Amino acid sequence: MKQYLDLEKYVLENGTQKGDRTGTGTISTFGYQMRFDLQEGFPIMTTKRVPFKLVVSELLWFLHGDTNIRYLLQHNNNIWNEWAFERFVKSDDYKGEDMTDFGLRAERDPAFKEVYQAEMEKFKTRILEDEAFANKYGELGNIYGKQWREWKTSQGETIDQLADLIEMIKTNPNSRRLIVSAWNPEDIPNMALPPCHSLFQFYVADGKLSCQLYQRSADIFLGVPFNIASYALLTHLIAREVGLEVGEFIHTMGDAHLYNNHIEQVKEQLSRTPHKLPKLVLSDKPATIFDFDVADISLDGYNPDPAIKAPISV
């Protein structure tokens, strides 16, 4: 997608070198927007392969209100492992090798990387096989799914923001309050990672449903391709339920950054030429957005260039 390649190029040429929480360092810009017409095809990277099934299982995890990585691991999805693992290795229950700054150390020290990978595999196995362990150390706190589906009020009640949103689109499509927020200041300290994609709003016009996402922190190379595909998929799922066509996905970013250890990968991607976008295929069986399974969602005509691997910063 040209819009995404333009973002990478813009940050490389105009970004500011900044330190960051992870210690990796970034090239960053503040305030950037991309627009995708969802009628022109499904917006997923074609200049590198994005594992679409992982996008699907993560979104369904959010939609279920789940915050435990066990569901993800059951679907061979490892994208949240590091944050749960970090909580475990900082606990008194962890008795293995020192895992301080495991992300950076694994990148720089091949011997440590082997030790880290072995500890991670043991952790994943315990999450899958030991329910009590999973309940304690698979939890990431009140992150996206919890805020979307069970926002706690000061009165001790809960708000299902997503169900309320869908009902409002059906009954009052001209509302300017078609908003879901994952940014709950009270819960931030207890989250494994505060919401990066923190608020989204829907808009209905001319029989089409559009979505705008505000993302406070955007990891351009690893995270943003997932975010684009995830919110485009969410827009399609909701549009199907409320009987509308899809319109645009607008992606607004606050701190949009390239990690310093992703620069060579970015240059490799910029050397590639975008291909035709695929089409999204949805099963007719699910009655509501909350009834979908991974097998109900697929892409037709997705023929991307090979994946480009890059380290994750935790």
Swiss-Prot record:
Binding-site positions, dUMP: R21, R176, R177, R216, S217, A218, D219, N227, H257, L258, Y259
Keyword annotations: Cytoplasm, Methyltransferase, Nucleotide biosynthesis, Transferase
GO CC aspect terms: cytosol
EC number(s) stated in the UniProt entry for this protein: 2.1.1.45
Localisation: Cytoplasm
Enzyme class: transferase
Active site (UniProt): C196
TM regions (residue ranges): none
Record carries keyword Transferase: yes
Classification via InterPro entries: Thymidate_synth/dCMP_Mease, Thymidate_synth/dCMP_Mease_dom, Thymidate_synth/dCMP_Mease_sf, Thymidylate_synthase, Thymidylate_synthase_AS
SUPFAM superfamilies attached to this UniProt entry: Thymidylate synthase/dCMP hydroxymethylase
GO biological process, one term: dTTP biosynthetic process
List of residues binding (6R)-5,10-methylene-5,6,7,8-tetrahydrofolate: D219, S313
Domain of life: Bacteria
GO molecular function term, any single one: thymidylate synthase activity
Pathway: Pyrimidine metabolism; dTTP biosynthesis
Similarity section: Belongs to the thymidylate synthase family. Bacterial-type ThyA subfamily.
Assembly and binders: Homodimer.
Function (record text): Catalyzes the reductive methylation of 2'-deoxyuridine-5'-monophosphate (dUMP) to 2'-deoxythymidine-5'-monophosphate (dTMP) while utilizing 5,10-methylenetetrahydrofolate (mTHF) as the methyl donor and reductant in the reaction, yielding dihydrofolate (DHF) as a by-product. This enzymatic reaction provides an intracellular de novo source of dTMP, an essential precursor for DNA biosynthesis.
Protein name: Thymidylate synthase
Species whose genome carries this gene: Listeria monocytogenes serotype 4a (strain HCC23)
Lineage, opening ranks: Bacteria, Bacillati, Bacillota, Bacilli, Bacillales
Name of the encoding gene: thyA
